[in-house]
Design a protein with these regions (language model features):
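Cytosolic regulatory modules rich in charged/polar residues
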Residues: 1-86
Length: 86
């Protein structure tokens, strides 16, 4: 992943949720765990919370987190930008 500033990150879609939690220093992943369904990756999580397939450039708001689908490869989300609202 890349950290652009204190609130903005770029992740690969295949990033494991547990690695995502560590990267953003999330102490309690309960909020994400309650909504992740069967997903284990960031891309899978976005599919779960949108209940569909987001388009490139689509913005998905989840509590104080804003995800933007930045890229696809072979119909898979491969890049996600995250902004954490303070």
């Amino acid at each position: 992943f890349s950290k652009l500033d204190d609130s903005t990150f770029v992740f690969e879609g295949k990033t494991a949720l547990k690695d995502f939690y560590k990267a953003i220093k999330l102490d309690d992943p309960k909020l994400f765990e309650e909504h992740k369904g069967e997903s284990e990756t960031m891309a899978g999580f976005l599919l779960e919370i949108t209940r569909g397939f987001p388009k490139k450039g689509e913005v998905i708001k989840f509590h104080k987190y804003t995800f933007t689908v930045e890229g696809f490869e072979n119909k898979r989300i491969n890049q996600i930008k995250l902004y954490i609202n303070k």
